[in-house]
Amino acid sequence: MVLAVSSCRTYSLSRRPRLGFITRPPHQLLSFLCPGLRTPRPSVPCALPRPRAMANSSSSWELPLVAVCQVTSTPDKQQNFKTCAELVREAARLGACLAFLPEAFDFVARDPAETLRLSEPLGGDLVGAYTQLARECGLWLSLGGFHERGQDWEQTQKIYNCHVLLNSKGSVVATYRKTHLCDVEIPGQGPMRESNSTLPGPSLESPVSTPAGKIGLAICYDMRFPELSLALAQAGAEILTYPSAFGSVTGPAHWEVLLRARAIETQCYVVAAAQCGRHHEKRASYGHSMVVDPWGTVVARCSEGPGLCLARIDLSYLRQLRQHLPVFQHRRPDLYGNLGHPLS
């Protein structure tokens, strides 16, 4: 079977465009499975987005554009902010309404002690700098995993892995604290004990309305638990976010598979901004940030280095797909217990 392929540009920090590729579902296969479903036209170039003022009546230019940023964070918080800000400004210049940053966008420390030392409260200088950046650029920011000193810091001396969503005015509109902590031992990758420095969040966050659609917040290891994504989808999410820092062993084996599975089972767009490359002598990340559509097709991706990729979110396509494949109407919660029930 031959997939229709269209070209799209990805952008590196050197500002020299690199030609990448995105795939769309086979037109004939989709038409056969879902008669009447409007499918993306094959072999249509994904050109550089026009400024909003120049947009014409063509539907493709009316779809919201999102940017997925990929970075290599280090313990140097100031340099990390400079790198992220450069990508966010580039995303704004290209017309994105929302930019996604990965888990640990603020820093990647060498050990738990350094993690605790570098952490800040939500109202600290770093988040303040990003609120100013959001206002300056006029776009929403998904800050994928901030090392947050919570209100219980003095008692616990532990932090939260906090996903912060800022609107274009720089206001914090939602926070989600990672509920599934990554305490694992992967052969060839070494042990990881996130709980040495981090507390699990107490609850999920209801999906948030944004210019791109209703977003459900999650972080990295959360993607391994489909109950979370199903709960967010049943609560109205149209876009699921998994900002991450996947390792070099689990990345090639599981990264794309898990993201596509979450998209297919929830019929949501999935946006996954990722860390990449070597952060320091003790840690490296897989990269390959991507956007997956509700059919499970990767519609945009970065490679291994720092940069960004762009995707348009087509909610009418999402709604048509849900109409033709109404899986949520066919669910049997009477058999599953509380598994995947909507958020209260």
Range-by-range predicted roles:
Residues 59-72:
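Short beta-strand segments enriched in small/hydrophobic residues
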Residues 66-69, 80, 88-118, 134, ...:
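Active-site beta-strand/loop signature of hydrolases that rely on acidic residues for catalysis
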Residues 123-151, 266, 270-274:
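A short, hydrophobic beta-strand-centered structural micro-motif
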Residues 1-34:
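N-terminal chloroplast transit peptides
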Residues 143-145, 161-165, 206-207, 289-291, ...:
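Short beta-strand scaffold segments in enzyme catalytic cores
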Residues 122, 128, 132, 149-235, ...:
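Active-site catalytic loop in hydrolytic enzyme cores
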